[in-house]
UniProtKB/Swiss-Prot annotation:
UniProt GO cellular component terms: cytosol
Database matches in SUPFAM superfamilies: Small protein B (SmpB)
Family according to the record: Belongs to the SmpB family.
One GO-annotated biological process of the protein: trans-translation
Originating organism: Coprothermobacter proteolyticus (strain ATCC 35245 / DSM 5265 / OCM 4 / BT)
Protein's recorded name: SsrA-binding protein
Gene name linked to the record: smpB
NCBIfam families for the chain: PRK05422.1, smpB
């Protein structure tokens, strides 16, 4: 499994409640560009419309070797391929106040298909973010002290 892009801010800004694996509909030059790692997930989010899941605001840079007439919108909405029950479950979460669905990472699976890891998340407050940072620093300090004693 080769990771093409990760949304590093997602785990910092959100508390991930549940994750899903979704296929994504891309054009040929988008696939080539994505496999080169030209993907940005930072501001992306998922919406459910008419029983279909769509990924908004994900930036895929135009493929370098594609001619000018074939270049499309780099931030267009892209359809996610999920089972109907998964879409309904995500829709149930999205109707609750304070919950959202965001992409966590994009990767190539063992069969060569590009997949997107979707997380249903709740936004963290500034206090929660500080607490997480503090816990991480304490854990790092304990590991550092443990290494010195050996």
């Amino acid at each position: 499994m080769k990771v093409l892009a990760q949304n590093r801010r997602a785990r910092h800004d959100y508390q991930i409640l549940e994750t899903y694996e979704a296929g994504i509909v891309l054009s040929g030059d988008e696939v080539k560009s994505a496999k080169e790692g030209n993907v940005q997930l930072r501001d992306a989010f998922v919406r459910v419309e008419n029983g279909e899941a769509w990924l908004y605001n994900m930036h895929i840079a135009p493929y370098e070797k594609t001619g000018e007439p074939f270049r499309g919108d780099s931030k267009r909405k892209r359809k996610l391929l999920l089972h109907k029950r998964e879409i309904n479950k995500i829709l149930g979460y999205l109707t609750q106040k304070g919950l959202t669905a965001i992409p966590l990472s994009m990767y190539v699976n063992d069969r060569g298909f590009i997949k997107v890891s979707i997380g249903v998340a709740k936004g963290k407050k500034m206090v929660d973010k500080r607490q997480t940072i503090k816990e991480r620093d304490i854990e790092r300090e304990l590991r550092r002290e443990g290494k010195i004693r050996y």
